[in-house]
């Protein structure tokens, strides 16, 4: 009888412990869902707060969820320009060497270096990116940044190979067209340059600068 009582008590304690250990799960899930939603909407500061809360309550054995949280925290750090962003990337790569997220993180780090005008570092990052594994939008961003880096190095041929890959329907096309038109202008390919700058007259980004180049082309061709 005594043995049965002890057995029932042990079950009760076990159940109480299990219930207590899972009591925070709904709150953790709520933090995680809010964090992911904020992340998807580019609200990096708020997303980081929610994701940190989610990580505190996450099951340490749930490696997949931890990996996803750590990936999103690393992206938040990159987007916010945090001082520890590079350390977080290194830690992520060490902790999850086979993660599918490593390629996206290298790409995001390259974008960060571009925003800081640290183009040699950006080039090194992009050189380790698997281009084919990127989605369509990231590929276009990659091509635009790589084209700009090569343009800045005066390697117009290589720059053109990147700019030419950007689809005319892309949100980044006007940027690519501007540099392609400028390269044509610099090479005295004025007919091609004129065609490009005329298309940019309606561009929100380049509509004001395009007339200057069109006027210069007319002058260089003696049309004055």
Task: Place the predicted regions along the sequence by residue.
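Acidic, polar-rich low-complexity tracts and alpha-helical solenoid repeat scaffolds
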Residues: 2-7, 18-224
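Hydrophobic helical h-region of N-terminal Sec-dependent signal peptides
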Residues: 9-15
């Amino acid at each position: 009888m005594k043995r049965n009582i002890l057995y029932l008590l042990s079950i009760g304690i076990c159940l109480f412990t299990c219930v207590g250990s899972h009591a925070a799960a709904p709150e953790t899930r709520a933090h995680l869902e809010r964090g992911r939603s904020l992340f998807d909407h580019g609200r990096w500061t708020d997303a980081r707060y929610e994701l940190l809360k989610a990580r505190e309550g996450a099951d340490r054995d749930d490696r997949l969820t931890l990996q996803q949280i750590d990936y999103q925290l690393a992206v938040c750090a990159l987007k916010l320009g945090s001082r520890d962003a590079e350390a977080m990337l290194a830690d992520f790569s060490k902790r999850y060497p086979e993660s599918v997220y490593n390629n996206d993180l290298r790409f995001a780090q390259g974008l960060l270096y571009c925003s800081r005008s640290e183009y040699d570092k950006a080039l090194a990052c992009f050189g380790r990116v698997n281009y084919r594994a990127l989605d369509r939008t990231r590929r276009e961003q990659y091509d635009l940044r790589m084209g700009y880096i090569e343009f800045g190095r005066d390697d117009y041929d290589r720059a053109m190979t990147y700019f030419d890959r950007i689809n005319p329907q892309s949100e980044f096309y006007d940027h690519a067209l501007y540099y392609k038109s400028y390269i044509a202008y610099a090479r005295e390919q004025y007919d091609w340059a004129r065609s490009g700058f005329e298309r940019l007259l309606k561009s929100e980004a380049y509509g004001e600068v395009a007339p200057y180049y069109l006027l210069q082309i007319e002058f260089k061709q003696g049309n004055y």
